[in-house]
Amino acid sequence: MSNDNSVNINNFSSMNGGGGGSDIQFPLKPSQQQQQQQQNSINQSTIRTLEITQELRYEIDFDQNGWMKLIEGTAECFGTELSLNKVYKLSGTKGAVFTWTGCKIEITNNCQPYIGEKTPMPQYAGVYQELDAFRVSILDEPKKSGPRVIIVGPTDSGKSSLSKILLAYSARSGYQPLFVDLDPGQGSITIPGTISAAHIQNPLDIEEGLAGGIPLAHFYGHTSLDVNPDLFKALCKNLASFIDKQLDSSNISRISGFIANTCGWIDGLGYKILLQNIDVFKANLIIVMDNEKLYSDISSHYSQKDNSIKIIKLPKSGGVFIRPPVFRKKTRMNRIKEYFNGINDNLSPHYIVLDFKDVSIYRTGGGPAAPASALPIGTSSQIDPLQITEVYPSLDMCHSIFAISYAKQASNIFHSNVAGFLYVSDIDMETKKITVISPAPGPLPSRFLLLGTLKWMEN
């Protein structure tokens, strides 16, 4: 996916890597005894036999390392086929391996594996078949867009899992759908605090996750929508405009369409934001995960407004795990760590020292503000949520994440996507220098840096 401002921000030249503003800290390194106990656990594995349409569910902590291997039959993980006898390393993840044919899988015991017999995978596959049929039906109709899918539902209802499955099946069929991530609390494409989009040309990598093309991202700067909902809505409009241009850029893009994942805030203001995004992204298929009321509300809303939108309801898998706040925080920590250090610590981030005079730091909304949910009933913030305010470097910016804007001038910051991210390691007020960590060496693409409430601790 390219545009005039594209640059590979996986290492900036690349962007793939509860509450905004809280420090994210690494766990301490395990002791030698703990490492030995962990190694002993890794060496212990079992072989699980799955019958037709069963799935093997697993869950492993962030400080554990395990693996699994398909030794007989065929199986897939989030729509991606497993290779026979290939060892897949697992750490800090939860998932499931599904089989249409029956299979045998060897897996380490620290993955806490168990077999689930009831799975909605046949229903998920049925939805993909509908998408495929729709794509085929518009092959010779250049004015029609392919599937524009928005997946909605409460937290921990399986939205991300379904997104991966539909994207993987699409890529396996030769399509190149856009994956649109509208959940700033998760950061599936880049890092938390962003909304982004990327073309998906291959199924997800089982070890490394989604492997999209060069992403386009807007920096929201927070992990919760209620910190600045007006900014979030405005950035979504910007991203939707980009999506329209991308789908018009080639026939394969038009036919492939997009799959959009959303956050789990589905009531009150969160529901209104969902409806706005359905409209601005011009969705033609809404998938509601595991919530009767949300399905009823959306169906009622669009039955009076737009009968061209199809709305379906799907159950969540029994393998969908409830993610406690600690797990969510660790997941966000890990996404930022992977951006700078690589999936398996295979990247070497670079320290760069910047003079105060060489950068301009901007904060949206005119400065920190209380979340909308924290304001007294009937009142609203007096701060313009879309105001761009330049701020002087200060010590409280240490451990913050800066986004590097592509804007050529300050007035264009709001409408510009970002080139990558920096971690603020130190600020020296006497020498007027900022020490940052960058995923790549060399000069910054722009002097304009964006600041939100996102923080991270390097060690």
UniProtKB/Swiss-Prot annotation:
Gene Ontology CC annotations of this record: mRNA cleavage factor complex; nucleus
Region annotation (Disordered) ranges: 1-43
SUPFAM superfamilies hit by this protein: P-loop containing nucleoside triphosphate hydrolases (SSF52540)
InterPro entries reported in the protein's UniProt record: Clp1 (IPR028606), Clp1/Grc3 (IPR045116), Clp1_C (IPR010655), Clp1_C_sf (IPR038238), Clp1_N (IPR032324), Clp1_N_sf (IPR038239), CLP1_P (IPR032319), P-loop_NTPase (IPR027417)
UniProt keyword annotation of Nucleotide-binding present: yes
Pfam families in UniProt: Clp1, CLP1_N, CLP1_P
GO BP term, pick one: mRNA 3'-end processing
Annotated localization: Nucleus
Keywords from the named record: ATP-binding, mRNA processing, Nucleotide-binding, Nucleus
Organism domain of life: Eukaryota
Annotated ATP binding sites: E55, K94, D156, S157, G158, K159, S160, S161
Biased composition, class Polar residues, residue ranges: 1-15
GO molecular function, one term: ATP binding
Chief localization: nucleus
PANTHER family: CLEAVAGE/POLYADENYLATION FACTOR IA SUBUNIT CLP1P, POLYRIBONUCLEOTIDE 5'-HYDROXYL-KINASE CLP1
Family of the protein in this entry: Belongs to the Clp1 family. Clp1 subfamily.
The protein's role, per its UniProt record: Required for endonucleolytic cleavage during polyadenylation-dependent pre-mRNA 3'-end formation.
Protein name: Protein CLP1 homolog
Taxonomic source organism: Dictyostelium discoideum
Highest classification ranks of the organism: Eukaryota, Amoebozoa, Evosea, Eumycetozoa, Dictyostelia
